[in-house]
Amino acid sequence: LHSALPAIIAGARCPLVDEDPSQAPLPKIAYVMSDGAALPLPYSRSVFGLKQAGWLVGSVATGQSWGGDLEAVSLHNGLLAARHVLGADIIVLTQGPGNLGSDTPWGFSGVACADALNAAAVLAGEPIAALRVSQADARVRHLGISHHSLTAYSRATLCSALIAVPELDGEFGELVKSQA
């Protein structure tokens, strides 16, 4: 989800446990936006704020989306542009604001997460996936690890990817652990 972008970037900026925070270099992070939701990148207040704060080195709009610092025809070109033109150490690729879903197993824009991971792998990157986890969504299919994450990562992704599973307490934590 586009709304996860600031949290993902905040996590990427945190030093590792064994690093001295004062000595840990901050990675150069670029945002690549797919065309699975709103097409104008300027609709994203998150990207604007992250760039203003210096947390993003730039943005790339891909496919039919537009309005990034750079624009690319495909996810693959967008990833390459972020790495080689913007000089990113880390690239976060999500759809833009807004979501499309049909309440069917395959009818949601988030299945495109698999395409992003596959593209990163094809380009010899290190695919890392972010889970959609919630206990606030009343829809059962989104309780714990959302069926969006489960479908995209276990059924549509054709490569290996790192996926961080949060360690949570209580009954909800047990649910997430069992789903992972």
Question: Language-model segments: which ranges?
Answer:
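Phosphate-binding glycine-rich loops and their immediate beta-loop-alpha structural context
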Residues: L1-A72
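Weak global preference for isoleucine
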Residues: I8-I9, I29, I90-I91, I128, ...
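Short, hinge-like loop/turn segments at secondary-structure boundaries
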Residues: F48, G78, I145-H148
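Glycine-rich anion/phosphate-binding loop at the beta-strand->alpha-helix junction
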Residues: W55-H142
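C-terminal functional extensions of proteins
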Residues: A136-A180
